[in-house]
Amino acid sequence: ASPGRGELRFAPGGDLLDARGIRWHVDGELSALDATVHGGESTLSTPTYPDALARLWSALTCPTSGEVLLSAAPGYEFVDWGGAAHVGGGSHGSLHASDSLAPLVLCGVDLPDDPPGQWAIRDVASLITKHFDQRAADL
């Protein structure tokens, strides 16, 4: 990651633990992602770019992602192929918290015994799938 604030190299499996419980090896400038380390250099925090390392790693290892990744600055977005723009709402191409975080309200869904420290779409999708699969089985 290198947004003009330094270079940061990272990979899964190091000593730093993120908010979702994933361990990372990082080398370089944490300021590239406005990241900080807490608790004796063991907990990685990236509030400006939630779940930054996992989201970037997922994109970098996607076979169809290409070789360059960009994240739009707050207030800007990359218009999709159909020409749709959503400035001020959910947009295309930003890892920033203003485009990544949203309220989550659940009703009638069984929560996991050990919920993640930071929720992601993949967690919600799993809950909803389990909920409706169970309801279909009960019919």
What are these regions (language model features)?
Residues 127-135:
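C-terminal alpha-helix
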Residues 1, 134-139:
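Polar, surface-exposed loop/tail segments
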Residues 1-114, 119-125:
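Active-site neighborhoods of enzymes that stabilize oxyanions during catalysis
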